[in-house]
């Protein structure tokens, strides 16, 4: 086989070898170098008629196996760089080095480039056997098609100019200096056919990503090449979707994504247009519009992000650090470098806020307590709040008629200049609780103070949020409260235009809202000054610091070690708010927050009881395995109201599960979209706006949206997967997920539906916490399901007196595997008290609440009360305290005998250790007086390992 391309659109010639059935199209190399022979590697657009009469199309589509059509837009740009829908199922003709493969179902592509320049050809490893789902080596030297000098790293080939490739170039920010004005292929077929084939608009360094198979489609002016997606899902530039660029159902094949932003035009096509059940993906998934699963914003099945740079052994998807294989999930996608978040008109925000607050029932707010304060003062109305008159006028305009519970408790403390830790349930009004007093105090500042801050490019207030979505929501809320004032509120976070943000700050900024990564970057590079900072707010502080258990202060070092920040400590107020708190929050709080004279702790405003909003109803379904979950999900979603699908957020645990779940829904005719951290920020915001405006009613997401998205008319939340992590963390995440519904302004309660798998260790460990939440709701119609109650009892029996550790790892308050000592809380497997390594005084058991594997009795082996292994009896003496792991005080063998007596001193079964019933009751009573989670200074998981949510793909790290 051979094919010649006539450059620059000239009249190409056609050559045929002995296979007369093969018809070769002309290739347009884009240079004047004349003809180029492509031997052995089928790089031009080709079609040939097979002996069975079916026609195969290489490079631009395939009509063959299964009758699928993965067509390209035939604009006669017949060079092979425009890979619309390379065949996954297509017959491969890998000649020369590759040979012909009979089993071609999983071939990545047939587009094997032979450069003939510099002795290199760049070809996909098409030796793939049945399981070869992606290229082994993206760039191989000419002499070998296997594993020779693979360049699966950050270096990409440069321009495709004519019949060759330029030298390697770095795939980093230096690409922004290139003037890439690649033609975006927007013209129609007829006009394009009549136009000259001028491919000189591929400049000398055009698109470090496009030469591998797709034209550099999006190189809009000033756009970072990193966003220049040539992704037509042909599988040509690395592993773009497995079948023709996307997830394919039987005999369907069109995957298109033309989710567009204002800044760029994306038309990610792949495949034909005859799909019977394709996924409409205007940024996600769709129903029966025969459009695609193209997933422009990121995620699996046709992510427009080109290849997996810096990732070796890229076989069928990138391997994450946790060892799992994403099977086609692409790396995160960035927004264009000059992308700017949409700023909504203030009048629109006022109308929206007024509508939401009109039916607000403050009577459903949870009660809170004020601790460590000089006085317990609470607002009962805005008129006696002492807030600036301009603020009061604004509150009237937006119909904020009633003071919420958390606001009534927090605002007076902030106005008095105190540092405050504030806790409230979701949708309780925490943003106004810290925002209104900050605005009030800035309005009352003298002009000199404000001018100095502006001259030094420094904000007076800095508000940090864990996610960009939450930061954007806070920004809109504070803009609403600041209307008719001269206070400037700005927003800056990752993927938004950095230079523009800096220019805005330099023009004056009173309140700066952002995520940690962007703000720390500004601080380290001295782009902003923290010298004049008067207010520092950590909103959703537990989520903000949840991955920083080992050294939360170290991760914030760029801010808290800044010279200006340290100098402003005396005059700065620090405020932290969240529905829950953890040890990392307390570490930062103890370092940064001031206490009142005579107090050991800072002022805390805490929930008196219950942490879940009363506006949320709970439902639980037992689902054994993935198949039952999918069946139950379809059953629930088909229960429409008046023929309309209820607005629903579906939570899954990992990013790559989003697409699979949405695919199943879409194949059933339900329009679903996905949103997770691999989507570019512009797409994330576009999807959220579509969801809020009812253009989308089903949204499949990760815990990225468990906080910070306020959709007042959200009907339902479905926990397809229960949250991950230890039980306390899982319960906290569950509360935040459930809190997305039942928002302020809803006339009816929201609904949180959860699928619980009794075969899952994660679900079993979380079961006791879920039972606690159900009981804490204190709703007459809400009962604990029998299956969940059984799971909770079983879990408690396996994991100590309080199920996997309220204070100590793997155990009760006394620590691991059942111990009731208090003190430090022990290490993992450890009892209460300080203890020693593997016990303070005995083998594997410490006296006075030993360490690992230790109880708090006499310190026997593995925590028994006799100083011998496995906790034998001690002359049948009554136990004085709980036994440790593997030790029952009254069991001669060291293991428990059946004992149905419920005496106060009888040993009660615990996880590999036994505690007296009296001790358990005392512990239970003590815990009921706490906040329901490891909060506010109690010892909590001192040796708990970080969850690494950013690494394993479970969540989305905004650092």
Swiss-Prot record:
Q: What class of enzyme is it?
A: hydrolase
Acidic residues bias (residue ranges): 942-959
Q: Residue limits of the Helicase C-terminal domain?
A: 632-792
Compartments reported by the entry? Cytoplasm, Perinuclear region; Cytoplasmic granule; Cytoplasm; Cytoplasm, P-body
Task: Enumerate the SUPFAM superfamilies for this protein.
Answer: P-loop containing nucleoside triphosphate hydrolases (SSF52540)
Q: Where is the composition biased (Polar residues)?
A: 98-118, 137-160, 202-213, 930-941
Q: What does this protein do?
A: Probable ATP-dependent RNA helicase involved in RNAi-mediated gene silencing. Specifically required in the endogenous siRNA pathway for biogenesis of secondary endogenous small interfering RNA (siRNA) intermediates called 22G-RNAs. May associate with and recruit rde-10 to primary siRNA-targeted mRNA for secondary siRNA synthesis. May be recruited to target mRNAs by rde-1 and/or ergo-1.
- What is the recorded name of this protein? DEAD-box ATP-dependent RNA helicase rde-12
Organism expressing this protein natively: Caenorhabditis elegans
Q: What is the lineage of its organism?
A: Eukaryota, Metazoa, Ecdysozoa, Nematoda, Chromadorea
Gene that this sequence comes from: rde-12
């Amino acid at each position: 086989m051979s094919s010649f391309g006539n450059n620059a659109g000239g009249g190409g010639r056609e050559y045929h070898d002995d296979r007369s059935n093969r018809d070769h199209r002309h290739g347009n190399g884009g240079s004047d170098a004349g003809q180029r022979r492509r031997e052995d590697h089928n790089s031009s657009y080709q079609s040939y008629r097979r002996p069975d009469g079916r026609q195969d199309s290489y490079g631009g589509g395939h009509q063959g196996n299964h009758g699928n059509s993965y067509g390209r837009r035939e604009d006669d740009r017949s060079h092979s760089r425009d890979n619309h829908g390379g065949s996954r199922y297509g017959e491969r003709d890998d000649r020369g080095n590759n040979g012909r493969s009979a089993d071609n179902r999983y071939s990545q592509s047939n587009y094997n480039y032979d450069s003939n320049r510099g002795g290199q050809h760049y070809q996909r490893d098409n030796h793939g056997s049945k399981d070869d789902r992606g290229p082994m080596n993206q760039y191989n030297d000419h002499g070998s098609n296997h594993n020779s000098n693979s360049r699966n790293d950050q270096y990409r080939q440069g321009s495709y100019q004519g019949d060759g490739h330029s030298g390697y170039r770095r795939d980093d920010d230096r690409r922004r200096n290139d003037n890439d004005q690649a033609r975006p292929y927007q013209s129609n077929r007829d006009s394009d056919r009549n136009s000259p084939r001028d491919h000189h608009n591929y400049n000398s360094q055009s698109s470090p990503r496009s030469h591998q198979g797709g034209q550099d489609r999006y190189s809009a002016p000033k756009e970072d090449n990193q966003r220049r997606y040539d992704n037509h899902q042909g599988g040509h530039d690395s592993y773009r979707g497995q079948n023709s660029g996307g997830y394919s159902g039987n005999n369907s094949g069109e995957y298109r994504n033309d989710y567009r932003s204002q800044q760029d035009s994306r038309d990610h096509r792949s495949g034909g247009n005859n799909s019977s059940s394709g996924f409409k993906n205007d940024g996600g998934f769709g129903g029966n519009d025969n459009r695609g699963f193209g997933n422009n914003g990121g995620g699996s099945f046709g992510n427009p992000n080109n290849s997996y740079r810096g990732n070796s052994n890229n076989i069928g998807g990138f391997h994450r650090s946790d060892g799992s294989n994403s099977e086609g999930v692409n790396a995160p996608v960035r927004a264009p470098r000059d992308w700017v978040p949409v700023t909504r008109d203030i009048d629109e925000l006022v109308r929206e806020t007024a509508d939401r607050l009109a039916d607000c029932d403050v009577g459903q707010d949870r009660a809170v307590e004020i601790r460590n304060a000089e006085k317990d003062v609470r607002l009962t109305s805005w008129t006696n709040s002492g807030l600036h008159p301009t603020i009061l006028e604004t509150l009237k305009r937006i119909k904020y008629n009633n003071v919420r519970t958390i606001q009534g408790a927090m605002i007076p403390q902030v106005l008095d200049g105190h540092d405050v830790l504030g806790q409230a349930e979701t949708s309780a009004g925490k943003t106004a609780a810290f925002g209104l007093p900050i605005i009030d105090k800035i309005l009352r500042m003298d002009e000199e103070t404000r001018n100095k801050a502006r001259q030094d490019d420094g904000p007076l207030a800095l508000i940090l949020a864990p996610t960009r979505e939450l930061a954007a929501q806070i920004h809109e809320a504070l803009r609403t409260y600041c209307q008719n004032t001269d206070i400037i509120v700005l927003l800056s976070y990752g993927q938004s235009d950095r230079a523009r943000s800096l220019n805005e700050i330099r023009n004056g900024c009173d309140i700066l809202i952002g995520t940690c990564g962007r703000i720390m970057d500004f601080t380290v590079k001295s782009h902003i000054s923290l010298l004049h900072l008067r207010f520092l707010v950590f909103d959703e502080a537990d989520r903000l610091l949840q991955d920083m258990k080992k050294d939360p202060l170290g991760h914030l070092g760029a801010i808290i070690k800044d010279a200006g920040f340290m100098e402003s400590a005396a005059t700065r107020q620090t405020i932290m708010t969240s529905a829950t708190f953890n040890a990392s929050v307390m570490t930062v709080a103890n370092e940064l927050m001031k206490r009142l004279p005579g107090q050991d702790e800072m002022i805390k405003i805490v929930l008196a009881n219950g942490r879940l909003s009363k506006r949320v109803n709970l439902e639980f379904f037992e689902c054994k395995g993935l198949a039952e979950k999918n069946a139950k999900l379809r059953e629930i979603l088909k229960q429409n109201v008046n023929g309309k699908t209820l607005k629903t957020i579906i939570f899954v645990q990992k990013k790559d599960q989003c697409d699979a779940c949405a695919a199943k829904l879409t194949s059933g005719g339900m329009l679903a979209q996905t949103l997770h951290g691999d989507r570019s920020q512009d797409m994330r915001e576009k999807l959220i706006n579509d969801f809020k405006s009812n253009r989308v009613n089903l949204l499949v997401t990760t815990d990225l949206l468990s906080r910070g998205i306020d959709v007042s008319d959200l009907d339902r939340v479905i926990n397809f997967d229960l949250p991950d992590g230890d039980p306390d963390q899982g319960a906290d995440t569950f509360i935040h997920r459930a809190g997305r519904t039942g928002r302020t302004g809803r006339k009816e309660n929201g609904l949180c539906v959860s699928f619980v798998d009794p075969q899952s260790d994660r679900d079993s460990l979380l079961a006791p916490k879920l039972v606690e939440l159900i009981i804490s709701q204190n709703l007459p119609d809400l009962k604990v399901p029998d299956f969940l109650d059984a799971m909770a009892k079983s879990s408690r029996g396996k994991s100590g007196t309080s199920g996997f550790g309220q204070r100590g790892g793997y155990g009760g308050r006394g620590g691991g595997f059942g111990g009731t000592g208090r003190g430090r809380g022990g290490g993992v497997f450890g009892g209460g008290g300080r203890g020693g390594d593997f016990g303070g005084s005995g083998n594997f058991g410490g006296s006075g609440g030993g360490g690992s594997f230790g109880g708090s009795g006499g310190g026997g082996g593995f925590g028994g009360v006799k100083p011998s292994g496995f906790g034998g009896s001690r002359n049948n003496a009554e136990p004085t305290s709980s036994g440790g792991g593997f030790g029952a005080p009254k069991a001669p063998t060291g293991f428990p005998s059946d004992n149905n007596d419920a005496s106060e001193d009888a040993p009660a079964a615990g996880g590999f250790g036994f505690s007296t019933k009296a001790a358990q009751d005392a512990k239970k009573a003590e815990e009921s007086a706490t906040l329901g989670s490891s909060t506010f200074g109690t010892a909590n998981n001192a040796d708990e390992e970080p969850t690494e949510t950013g690494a394993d793909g479970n969540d989305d790290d905004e650092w």
